[in-house]
Amino acid sequence: MSVSAAQKTALAWVETARDVLSADCARIFEFAEPAWREYRSSAWYVERLRAEGFTVEDGSGGMPTAFCAEWSNGAGPVVGMYAEYDAVPGNCQA
């Protein structure tokens, strides 16, 4: 299977950002906020995304912990993501 130039670029970026991405995941894990109360996590993500140049709508859909982030560099592919990061009581993260 051949790897396209775009795939090589994406893989190189992930490799370069690996430590930062890992630290970001650890930070959210450490907040360990239960469902509907992810206030610190949400605020951290919103700040982080804005620092990276995203336009962020916080409080999306009337939910204080929900947000929608958007970034564009022109026409091209669109990537959508959805994340659940609440801690579940009784499991290792809560």
Regions found by a protein language model. Name each.
Residues 3-94:
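Acidic/His- and Gly-rich active-site-bordering loop/insert found
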